[in-house]
């Protein structure tokens, strides 16, 4: 079995030879590397104040606000450590994008770590959000496609956007763009738990023959995260040609991306 770096480099080389540049999908794990709490991390703090709730994720945040109010949510978030501007994984992503390896990025994060890293490295980019209709363009400029508009102060974003209502409102729009773009390009998932129901539901909605025809994609995640996925979801990803590249921990994920960026020049 090839080493993770060789498996990923080989995947990129195969696509480059075929004239394809994968979409780089950056999830919450990348922001966590810069000190931002993941939704799962926020849940831990919320459950300390609301131990009786059986909800999780977006529904738990909405439940917390309904029971204790937005001011209490703000107080809980205020106790979380202040994050850093960006982390080595963001610098690696910027270098990869600047080298033309992955000129299109999708992100579901609420912060500006990606943009900050691109500015520091000196990579020109254009940013669009899902509220805008967009078509992936050719050319030299990197495109950053955001699920959530107006990123900035993460605490304000969590209070305003991480809610069941906002999640449901964004659902059909994201599915539309998944169907429009992921049918035509391979994807590399980084910092993603692969449990986002919008992605899984979109894949499940496709006929088996359509899933089989999707470009091969790769998910870079820890073994623990992969095993945490329900077996039916692992089977669903496999049916859509999504294969995992497994690493022992999150530090190794960062190391993989840094090494890949070094190879890209």
Predicted region positions:
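SIR2/sirtuin-family catalytic core signature
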Residues: 1-24, 30-34, 45-49, 54, ...
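Conserved subregion of the PPM/PP2C metallophosphatase catalytic domain
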Residues: 114-119
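Active-site-proximal beta-strand elements of phosphoester/diester hydrolases
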Residues: 144-149
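Active-site glycine-centered loops adjacent to acidic/histidine catalytic or metal-binding residues
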Residues: 27, 109
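Active-site glycine-rich loop that binds ribose-phosphate moieties when present
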Residues: 160-176
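Short, glycine/acidic-enriched capping/hinge loops at junctions between secondary-structure elements
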Residues: 34-40
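Short glycine/proline- and acidic residue-enriched helix-loop micro-motifs
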Residues: 72-80
């Amino acid at each position: 079995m090839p080493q993770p770096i060789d498996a990923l480099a080989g995947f990129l080389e195969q696509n480059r030879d075929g004239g394809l540049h994968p979409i780089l999908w950056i999830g919450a794990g990348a922001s966590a590397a810069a000190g931002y709490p993941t939704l799962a991390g926020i849940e831990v703090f919320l459950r300390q104040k609301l131990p009786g709730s059986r909800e999780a994720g977006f529904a738990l945040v909405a439940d917390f606000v309904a029971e204790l109010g937005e001011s209490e949510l703000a107080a809980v978030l205020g106790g979380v450590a202040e994050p850093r501007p960006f982390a080595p994984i963001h610098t690696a992503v910027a270098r990869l994008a600047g080298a033309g390896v992955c000129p299109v990025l999708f992100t579901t994060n609420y912060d500006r770590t990606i943009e900050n890293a691109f500015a520091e490295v000196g990579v020109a980019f254009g940013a669009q959000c899902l509220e805008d209709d967009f078509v992936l363009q050719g050319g030299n400029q990197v495109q950053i496609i955001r699920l959530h508009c107006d990123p900035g102060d993460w605490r304000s974003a969590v209070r305003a956007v991480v809610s069941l209502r906002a999640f449901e409102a964004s659902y059909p729009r994201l599915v539309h763009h998944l169907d429009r773009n992921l049918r035509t390009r391979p994807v590399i998932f980084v910092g993603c738990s692969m449990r986002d129901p919008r992605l899984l539901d979109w894949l499940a909605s496709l006929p088996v023959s359509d899933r089989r025809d999707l470009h091969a994609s790769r998910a870079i995640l820890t073994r623990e995260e992969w095993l945490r996925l329900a077996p039916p979801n692992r089977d669903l990803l496999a049916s859509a040609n999504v294969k995992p590249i497994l690493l022992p921990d999150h530090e190794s994920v960062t190391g993989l991306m840094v090494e890949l960026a070094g190879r890209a020049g």
